[in-house]
Every structure is written in structure tokens, then in C-alpha cells.
Regions:
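Non-catalytic nucleic-acid-binding interfaces of large nucleic-acid enzymes and RNP effectors
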Residues: 1-587, 593-713, 720, 725, ...
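Short glycine/threonine-rich loop-to-helix capping motif typified by GTGT followed
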Residues: 750-755
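Conserved short loop/turn motifs at secondary-structure junctions
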Residues: 587-589, 605, 742-748
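Ordered, soluble secondary-structure elements with a strong preference for glycine-centered loop motifs
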Residues: 717, 749
Length: 810
């Protein structure tokens, strides 16, 4: 380790710098939190919880006042319309007014328990005015909307978000603004406020402002402020932008979170949300020594910025190359400057609105990507001042590992993966070079060739690769035009590594499971056909499950052209075969319990029917999704039996309001707990009826969520176990550098043969006995119950064959 080569003074300097970084991280995160909070105080989580309890508490009192007013015979005619908003909204609007005018950050740090109401508190008059203004605006808007419904519906085609400003403009345009005198507003607002003052939520204090002048100041009670302050304090660190570490992270322990040096900014080792009032220990998954050792080993991996890639990436970004998915650095060409067609037809105006919305939507996405790239490159520049850095990790409740910072992480996107490599160069070997060539060919979309063919492809293209390294700006063969999972800069990093002349290597070589979720299901159900298609069983060349499903889907469409008007159109568009990319995402996710909605979502997101006119695209998405679902159903028959079994067990256990718990072979105990969510729709729907929903967790389990989530979570827990069991054996072999992303394993090229052997051995270890049987036995023993028998499987299946499968992880 490079850390061990530092002297005591150098170690202290880096540790001190890390402490300063963490203090700055905390300070800037807190400032960012309060800045965001101040933009919409009433939408803060603590304030939402306050509103929830306040509305429940105050609504009966407002209703009592409404009933009393309605019983009277001398009520002014202007009052009844204002009462139409209802008691709950009255309570909500009143408390929101106090939040808006009273709450500041300093309120939570200087609570005066002696005098109660600070002199900086707003007056009852100002709060009353805000209450009445809001209620009147809402009532006027609702009247206008009801009276001019056709106009409102027509404008809604162009206005996606009816903001308060637009609502007021609509009301004014329709001429439905009812005027109220200052006295009427004051009377109404003061009545609303007096009811709230009768509770222990807010309080008032009379202060003298001078000669014969006094004012009633309004604030929340000290106890309410104290509770709000506690909740804000717990949320402040959530706005921190984490970064890598300059010194080794603090190791995780079974009962102690590790990672950053400062305990108050560490993320929980296993993140889990717990119902209010419940003991978190009853809901936490539990790591084993094997998992902890692996997690800490990943954190101890030393990384460095790849300076060659950084130079190219930053040059291209700041010079607006806008290739390889790089966002624009400047936005001079992004303004939607075409003027609105005032004299055009309704169709032309609607088209302009649609194009304008789409253009500015793309601008917003680009602006986000631009901001993120600026942060990424700034962080890379900072880390380049140091020879190496570390990345803390945490776990989810299934045992999967995640970096705390996506930027400059092996779990990040192409930019981040390409910008880093292992910090310490080691001597390259003949086998390491072979794996580097295979890795390079994979990145250049040659991963369906045999290994020898991939090596040959690289050898045949070495002149191109050398030209790329010499001038990557002009020679752009490394640039991909893919919108998603674009590998361009990883290609560039591989080219730089291939052309090294110092005999050393630093680039992580990745080996990806061939649809790892399906690989696990093929082994669990002993499905020979599926095992062959996912390279669990040996073959002379890599098999392609995605293309197989695509071919099945194509055959279904070809054989059933009379069943759908869309099938002939699909066959005309994809003349010879359905591209594998159309089936890839759905096939990849099927092992995790894919729904028909999920298939439609992926078809739409990945643009597989973008060639269809917009007005027809919805139908195309549905029909292509149906065909894909039928294609998958014929391939995944046996895994579907396993998923059905898991869901049946989830249904039975959830009926007893007990969590699903199982232990994987890594020793990790999974607590599969989805609690019912208690939601409250905000009564401040105000103008546009947009629902502001906030929630708390109930101690009761959500049976539907338990049912739906068990299939993906079960498989994810076992792929996590596979990863940590592999890392455990690699540590015994002396390997200390890991670039692992769930089912993509990476290390130095010279160590790949060892890693390849070990990941197969651990897969055999897991599947020698049936994970479904282990799941069943654990639950039966824990709850002293008898569960249904697991589905039958083909026992004439030798799982040790995977040891000979060359393309199991390719």
C-alpha cells in the first residue's frame, strides 16, 4: 500500500487535511440544507410533520367555529364563500402562514424559554393578512376554474404546472376576483389566528412599541421549536456532497459504522428506514465477518486520477466538443428563440408549445449534466494533487455494497470510471496483457467474439489504437454515440493503458456476469437450457440470452400478425431480426420480478419505437411490450416457478405481520421489511390541486410490497453473497485491490486468472445446495412453521460444470 510508504509526518499531514475537508463538508452541507429550506419552508420534512399533527389537532376547533358561524343569522354575505375551503384547509393555511413569516434558521438555535416570543416575531396583523390573502386567492381561483372550466382545460394543454402566479393570472383574466375590504380581511384572518392560538402549538405576546402603541407578536411555542430543531439537525448532514478520502477510512465493525474520520458525517453501514417509535435493531440486516472484511477491503483499495483521460475530458468539455455524451459547457445555442405563432392555427400553436417545452426540458437536463461535470472535474483536479485516495462504502439491507460518492467511483458512469485507476502500478504480465486486450475489445462492442477473436481484434487494430492515443481529438474511433451506458472514455483509458511503454499496469480489468440474475436462477432451478444461454454451462463461444429472447419475440410477432395491427409494422421496420438491444433491458431485469409496466417503461425510455409518430407511439409501446413479455415467458418458465414460490411464502409470512428473514452463504442476515406507509396529502393543495404528499412508516408490514419485492431482493442478496465470498478468497490469495460493482468484478490484469477461478468456486459453493431450500429452512426454524415445498428442479445438472465455463464472467 502506498499509505504504508509514507512517513509519520506525511501521514499526519494527510489525516489533518482529511479532517479539515470533513469539517468543510459538514459546514457547506449544512449551509446548503438551510439555503434549500429557506426557498420553501413549509415543505421541509420537519414542518410537514408539524403540519400533519397540527391539522389533526386543530381541525375540530375550526369546524366548531364554522358550525357556530353558519348557525348565526347575522353573518355578513362575504363570509360563507370563504368557509367553503373547509376546516382542515383553514388549519393548514394558518400554520403555514406562521411558518412562512416566523421561522428562520436562528429560531432553532436561540429558543427563549423565559420570555417565549422573540421581538423579531411577526405581528398578528401581518399573519392575519397573509392568511386571508391566501384563502381569498384560493376561493377566487376555484370559482374561476369552475365557472370557466372549458378555458381552464384548454390552457391546461399548454400549462403543465399551475403555479400560484399562473392561477392568479387565470383568475384575473377571467374576471372572477372578488374584492374584500381591509376590514373584512382583517376580521377573517384574526378569527383564523385566534383559533390556532387556543392550542399549545403557537403563542402570542403583547409588546409595547412606544407611546400608546402595542402589538401582538406570534411565534411557535418553545417545545415545538425545540422538536423542529432536533429534526432539522438530523437532516442537515443529508445535503452533504461526499468526496473520496485522503487517508484510509475507519473500518466498519458489527456494531459501529466506519468510513469517514468524523463520526457525525459517517453514513450508516447498513442503511434502513425504520417506523417511528420502533427499535431499529429489530429491522436491521446483520453483516458477517466475511462481509465486513470484504467491505473494509474495498474501502482500503487505493485509487488515483487517470491524468491522461482527465486532460482529454477537460479539454473537450471546456471547448464544447459535445461528443461522447459530454454536456455543453456554454449554452449559447440552447435558447429556444423561435417566436410564438400569434397568427397561427391552434395546431401550430400547440406544436410550438410542445417543442418549446421539450427544448427547455433538454436544456434543463444539460444544465444539470454541466453542473455535475464541473464538480467532477474540479474534484479530479483536487485529487490529482495527491498520489492516491480512498472511497468509503456502505451496504443496503440485501448486502449489496455502494460507494458513498458516485463521482470518481468505479460504480459511477463512464466519466467517473474512466477518470480513475488503481493508484499503485504493478508489473504487467503476458496473461495480464491478454486480459487487457479482451477488456478493450469488450468496450469496443466485440464482446460476442471468442476470447482469441477479441485478442486478434485488438492486435489487428493496434494502429488505430496508437493513433487514438497520439491524437484523441482528431482520431475519434473511440467515441460512441450511445445515449445510455456510453463507454467512450473507458475505451480511451484502455487505449492509453495498452500503449504504456513502462511495463506496468494500473487499469482495473472488469469481468461481467452474463446476465447474473438469470445465471443464479438457472443454477437454483437447474435449468439446463437457461444455464447454457447464460454461460453457466461451458460452450466454445459466448452465448447471448438477449438475442435469443429477441429472436423468440420476433418469431411470436411473425406467427401472430393477425392478432395485432402493430406486428406487421414491427416486422417491416426490423426486416430480418429484432435487435438484441430491444430485448436486453427487459431480459436483464426479468430475473428480479419484472412487470408488464416495467417492460413498457424500458421500451419507452430506450427509444425503441421512437421511429413511430408521437401520436401513435403509446400503442406501439404497449404492443411491443406484449410481444417481449410473451418472448420472455417462454424462456423464463422455470425461474418463474421459483419467483412464484418466493411470492407465495411472502404472502404467507406477511399475513402474520412478520418480516421475511434469511441468511446467505456469506453469513449476511437479510431483514426483508417493507412497512405500511401512512400518507397525508397536504391540505395546502391551494391553487392547482397539486398534491404535496408526505409520509411516515407504520409498524405494520405492507403485504403487497413484501410480495412484490421478494423476488428481486432474494436474487440481489445472493449476488451480493457471491461477491463478498469471492473477495474473501481473493484476500487469502494476497489480492488487495478491488473494482467491484455488484455483478461486475475487477482487479489488476495479472490477477484476473486467480479472480476468475475463485468466482467460479464460490458460485459452486453457493449452488451445491439449493438457496430456495436454505430460505425455506431458515424461516421454518425461526417462526416454527411449515412452508410449502420448493418447486422441483432437474437434478441431472452438474453445477461444477461452471468451473469449466470460459465465458461465465466475460
Amino acid at each position: 500500500m502506498l499509505w504504508d510508504k509514507l512517513n509519520a509526518v506525511e501521514k499526519k499531514e494527510r489525516t489533518d487535511q482529511q479532517i479539515l475537508w470533513e469539517e468543510d463538508l459538514l459546514t457547506s452541507g449544512i449551509e446548503r440544507y438551510w439555503k434549500d429550506w429557506s426557498r420553501a419552508k413549509d415543505e421541509g420534512k420537519p414542518e410537514q410533520l408539524l403540519l400533519e399533527s397540527a391539522v389533526i389537532h386543530l381541525t375540530p376547533y375550526y369546524q366548531q367555529w364554522i358550525d357556530k358561524v353558519c348557525e348565526g343569522s347575522k353573518n355578513p354575505e362575504w363570509l360563507p364563500p370563504l368557509l367553503s375551503i373547509g376546516a382542515a384547509k383553514m388549519a393548514d393555511i394558518t400554520i403555514r402562514a406562521v411558518i412562512e413569516l416566523f421561522l428562520t434558521r436562528s429560531c432553532f438555535t436561540s429558543i427563549d424559554y423565559v420570555h417565549g416570543v422573540p421581538l423579531s416575531a411577526p405581528s398578528a396583523q401581518s399573519i392575519s393578512k397573509l392568511i386571508s390573502d391566501n384563502v381569498i386567492s384560493i376561493v377566487n381561483y376555484q370559482r374561476a376554474k369552475k365557472t370557466f372550466k372549458d378555458d381552464w382545460l384548454r390552457q391546461s394543454k399548454f400549462i403543465k404546472n399551475w403555479t400560484p402566479k399562473r392561477c392568479r393570472a387565470f383568475t384575473k383574466k377571467m374576471g372572477k376576483i372578488h374584492k374584500y375590504t381591509p376590514k373584512q380581511k382583517e376580521d377573517f384572518g384574526h378569527n383564523m389566528l385566534r383559533i390556532a392560538l387556543s392550542s399549545d402549538i403557537i403563542q402570542g405576546k403583547v409588546v409595547w412599541l412606544g407611546r400608546n402603541r402595542k402589538s401582538l407578536l406570534i411565534s411557535f411555542s418553545p417545545d415545538v421549536l425545540k422538536e423542529l430543531g432536533k429534526r432539522h439537525e438530523a437532516l442537515e448532514t443529508g445535503s452533504m456532497v461526499y468526496r473520496p478520502m485522503l487517508c484510509p477510512p475507519v473500518p466498519h465493525e458489527k456494531n459501529k459504522d466506519g468510513g469517514f474520520l468524523s463520526p457525525w458525517i459517517r453514513k450508516r453501514m447498513i442503511k434502513r428506514y425504520h417506523p417511528i417509535g420502533c427499535d431499529p435493531r429489530d429491522y436491521n440486516s446483520k453483516p458477517s465477518d466475511t462481509v465486513l472484511d470484504g467491505l473494509n477491503a474495498m474501502m482500503m483499495t487505493e485509487w488515483a486520477v487517470n491524468k491522461d483521460v482527465y486532460k482529454v475530458m477537460s479539454t473537450m468539455f471546456f471547448n464544447d466538443y459535445r461528443i461522447a455524451n459530454l454536456p455543453a459547457h456554454t449554452f449559447k445555442d440552447f435558447a429556444f428563440s423561435r417566436s410564438f405563432p400569434d397568427e397561427g392555427t391552434k395546431l401550430e400553436k400547440a406544436k410550438w408549445m410542445s417543442e418549446s417545452t421539450e427544448a427547455w426540458g433538454e436544456w434543463y437536463k444539460e444544465e444539470q449534466a454541466r453542473s455535475r461535470m464541473l464538480v467532477r472535474l474540479s474534484l479530479a483536479r483536487k485529487m490529482m494533487e495527491y498520489d492516491f485516495f480512498y472511497m468509503p462504502y456502505t451496504l443496503d439491507f440485501r448486502g449489496r455494497a455502494y460507494t458513498v460518492c458516485e463521482l470518481l467511483s468505479c460504480q459511477g458512469i463512464d466519466f467517473d470510471r474512466a477518470l480513475i485507476h488503481f493508484a499503485e502500478p504493478i508489473p504487467q504480465t503476458e496473461r495480464g496483457l491478454r486480459w487487457l486486450k479482451i477488456h478493450t475489445a469488450n468496450l469496443f462492442d466485440q464482446d460476442k467474439l471468442t476470447y482469441d477473436e477479441r485478442v486478434k481484434w485488438v492486435d489487428d487494430n493496434m494502429d488505430m489504437i496508437k493513433a487514438i492515443v497520439e491524437d484523441p481529438y482528431r482520431n475519434r474511433e473511440w467515441v460512441s454515440d450511445a445515449k445510455k451506458k456510453n463507454p467512450s472514455f473507458q475505451r480511451l483509458a484502455a487505449c492509453f493503458e495498452l500503449c504504456r511503454t513502462d511495463g506496468m499496469t494500473q487499469l482495473p480489468i472488469q469481468k461481467d456476469g452474463a446476465n447474473n440474475g438469470v445465471q443464479h436462477w438457472a443454477a437454483i432451478m437447474r435449468d439446463k437450457k437457461l444455464a447454457k444461454l447464460t454461460n453457466v454451462l461451458p460452450s466454445s463461444s459466448p452465448q447471448d440470452l438477449y438475442q435469443y429472447v429477441a429472436d423468440k419475440t420476433y418469431d411470436i410477432m411473425n406467427q401472430n400478425t393477425a392478432d395485432s395491427d402493430w406486428y406487421p409494422r414491427f416486422l417491416d421496420h426490423w426486416v430480418e431480426e429484432l435487435p438484441r438491444k430491444v430485448a436486453k433491458r427487459s431480459t436483464m431485469c426479468d430475473s428480479y420480478g419484472l412487470t408488464f409496466y416495467g417492460i413498457q417503461k424500458y421500451v419507452k425510455e430506450e427509444g425503441h419505437v421512437d421511429w413511430v409518430a408521437k401520436e401513435e407511439r403509446g400503442g406501439a409501446i404497449v404492443e411491443l411490450s406484449r410481444a417481449l413479455q410473451d418472448g420472455l415467458r417462454g424462456v423464463m418458465e422455470k425461474p418463474n416457478l421459483g419467483k412464484d414460490y418466493l411470492r407465495e411464502v411472502a404472502r404467507l409470512i406477511s399475513a402474520t405481520n412478520k418480516p421475511l428473514i434469511w441468511e446467505t452463504d456469506s453469513g449476511f442476515v437479510v431483514q426483508h421489511v417493507y412497512n405500511q406507509i401512512i400518507e397525508r396529502i397536504s391540505y395546502a393543495e391551494l391553487f392547482n390541486k397539486q398534491q404535496l404528499v408526505f409520509s411516515t412508516l407504520s409498524p405494520d408490514l405492507d403485504g403487497d410490497a413484501q410480495f412484490l419485492a421478494i423476488s428481486p431482493n432474494f436474487i440481489h442478496s445472493w449476488d451480493a453473497a457471491h461477491m463478498f465470498m469471492t473477495i474473501s478468497l481473493m484476500l487469502l490469495e494476497g489480492i488487495r485491490s478491488f473494482s467491484f460493482v455488484h455483478d461486475s468484478y475487477g482487479t489488476y490484469g495479472p490477477y484476473i486468472d486467480t479472480m476468475d477461478r475463485l468466482l467460479r468456486e464460490t458460485f459452486v459453493q453457493i449452488h451445491q445446495s439449493n438457496p430456495l431450500e436454505k430460505f425455506k429452512s431458515y424461516l421454518e426454524k425461526k417462526y416454527e412453521i411449515n412452508l410449502p415445498e420448493i418447486p422441483n428442479r432437474d437434478e441431472d445438472f452438474d453445477i461444477t460444470e461452471v468451473l469449466r465455463s470460459e465465458y461465465f464472467f466475460g
